[in-house]
Amino acid sequence: MILFPAIDLKGGQCVRLKLGDMQQATVYNTDPAAQAKSFEDQGFEWLHVVDLDGAFAGHSANGDAVEAILKATKNPVQLGGGIRTLDHIEAWLSRGLRRVILGTVAVRNPDLVIEACRKFPGHVAVGIDAKGGKVAVEGWAEASELGVIELARKFEGAGVAAIIYTDIDRDGILAGINWTSTLELAEAVSIPVIASGGLASLDDVRRMLEPDAQKLEGAISGRALYDGRIDPAEALALIKASRAKETA
């Protein structure tokens, strides 16, 4: 189980949105690279980065900030937001990115995701952002009629490294993860699922370590870490203890 600290980029700064609203952005750090290094120093093993401007624009909009992050941390980084073509994917992986997250393109062009998995095995994740059980696209600005599980099942057997599942209705408001829908998705597919949206406290960390959540690869935490609601040392100690039990 992995706890992924999140860096969301808007205008080259590290921000958090409330309910996916770009007009409700709180700046937490003007130096994303320094934030990435701080997360590494705290003991985190991975980093989750989202180019928010890119998600809306349909192309990379915070490339300089992402490259600075990649230079600042030795941790593997996964990036989503505005990655829509095989050339985009190849360009980022060649710069040292470990994993790309494909969201809107997974809805618009699922065959591209399948081709990307074939061409870049182990390096492609799918981001499914949901509102009211339906998939949202274009930086959460546009709703679709596609169901979450319906979309996820399109990629069974394709080699998708993980599905990052975000409940938009809980993102950035510290309401707790929607465990019901998250675990339903994890049970419905064989692809590892990463929970996102609403992680609020150590209780959520403990919840993701329960036996019925073992199909999850982990969870993403943003605002709860920035606001000090989750102590990194305590959270990582819980995860370490859980891993020790599994290998005992």
Curated annotation (Swiss-Prot):
SUPFAM superfamilies on file: Ribulose-phoshate binding barrel
Tagged with keyword Amino-acid biosynthesis: yes
Annotated pathway: Amino-acid biosynthesis; L-histidine biosynthesis; L-histidine from 5-phospho-alpha-D-ribose 1-diphosphate: step 4/9
Transmembrane segments: none
GO cellular component: cytoplasm
Presence of the UniProt keyword Amino-acid biosynthesis in the record: yes
InterPro entries to which the protein is assigned, alphabetical: Aldolase_TIM, His_biosynth, HisA_bact_arch, Isoase_HisA-like, Isoase_HisA-like_bact, Rhodanese-like_dom, RibuloseP-bd_barrel
Any Pfam family hit: His_biosynth
EC number, as in UniProt: 5.3.1.16
A molecular-function term among this protein's GO annotations: 1-(5-phosphoribosyl)-5-[(5-phosphoribosylamino)methylideneamino]imidazole-4-carboxamide isomerase activity
Family, as annotated: Belongs to the HisA/HisF family.
Protein name (record): 1-(5-phosphoribosyl)-5-[(5-phosphoribosylamino)methylideneamino] imidazole-4-carboxamide isomerase
Gene: hisA
